[in-house]
Amino acid sequence: MNDLRHLSRDEQKLLADVALLVKDDDQEFNYEMLKVAAPDEASGEFWFRMAEMLSTLPPNQSLDLRMNGGRLTVAVSILSVLLQDNPDIPQLWAQKIIALNYLAHGHQTRAIGLAQQPDKAAEANEEEYLAKALSQNLLSTLKDAIERFPEDAWFIGMRDDAWKHFGPKEAV
């Protein structure tokens, strides 16, 4: 983690708590509560660092695919707000793309797995819908990022990869 000593003590403590929750892969915790626990005057960097931590996989490489209170969805939510005020910061776009990529692939994989079980058809359909919605969000975010940063090879590579997995056949 980057040097965070310039952040307030409250910001540093909350980020340390977030790091432990992610490390321990706590998928029972409602990560939305972190927004409420944040200091009133939390800095933009604090919010970015929190979103960055939440969209980083824990040591066991487990995805938290919960749509309400899950690590990745909270990261996307935070980054979406940050991008409204700071659209010219490529790191914000990249971190949102990383989180959306995990979510889209995770829900797509879950949908495929559930579709193999006849008694799980309804759940498979729900997961397929989520995968399609998330993949469209991913592709749209990549399009917007490339419009802002047309020479950025990372965004172009991510778009090409996402297009392979979530191209027209996956459109909502």
Question: Which residues make up each language-model segment?
Answer:
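Short intrinsically disordered terminal tails
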Residues: 1-2, 169-172
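Amphipathic alpha-helical repeat scaffolds of TPR domains
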Residues: 4-20, 39-63, 88-128, 133, ...
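Helix-turn-helix repeat elements of alpha-solenoid scaffolds
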Residues: 18-32, 64-78, 130-137
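Conserved positions within tetratricopeptide repeat
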Residues: 31, 69, 76, 93, ...
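Canonical positions in the second alpha-helix
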Residues: 36-37, 81-82, 118, 145
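Charged low-complexity stretches with an acidic bias
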Residues: 74-81, 85, 89-91
